[in-house]
Amino acid sequence: MSLTVEVDVMGTIVTLSLFHADGVDADRAKPYFDEAEHVLREVDRVFSTYRPESPVSRLRRGEMALGEAPPEVAEVLDLCREAREMTAGWFDPWAMPGGVDPTGLVKGWAAGRALSVLAAAGTDGALVNAAGDLASGGVVAPGQAFRAGIADPASPGTLAAIVELDGALATSGTYERGSHLLNPHTRVRESAVASASVTGPDPALADAFATALCVGGEAVFERLIDLDGYEALLIGFDGSQRLSPGFALVEASV
């Protein structure tokens, strides 16, 4: 049995879920849901580029030094540097117009922080779904792992694949918005594939890798398959799929 709370934050709906074989007590779960929501709202307050007075917006405009910003900003930018190096620059927040923009990693990072709060509730499992960025811990029920669907970018409302989830899943793609990702090497908004999904232990890095794969395609895929714990699924504009050897695909073309 499960209990789910929806939070309208970061320009999307984030779902917070707890799972337990004997059921989830709503009163006992409430403090964990409340704290997880607080974490998400604080991330939005600090990192939103749509809030003119957020620390990240002020940092981008040169009105605030990094040392004056909340410490989590430096933490996230360190992760961004790590992801930039691991993707050979295909993920590069410093290439964004208007100054450094860690948006391509923050949602996954926020999901991971919220999951850490929910995991302390002591249930069989916990799940955070931040509109394409999933962070999971534990199981749905004893012996039953989490599963997640990957949307078909060419057919809204249908699934291209189902994956067994142990940790994080991040998906980036064209979907309804078309090509919205900036190629950091050409500074042009373009995508190499229709969709890129990444599983792995760190929701923030999975988020960054999915973004990099979407714009870099095969060039990033070849680097990613050498990273311990991370797997990928690419869906081409023609519907073709390419999986890394360890991608936990349950079902394709659903």
What are these regions (language model features)?
Residues 1-254:
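Mature catalytic core of soluble alpha/beta enzymes
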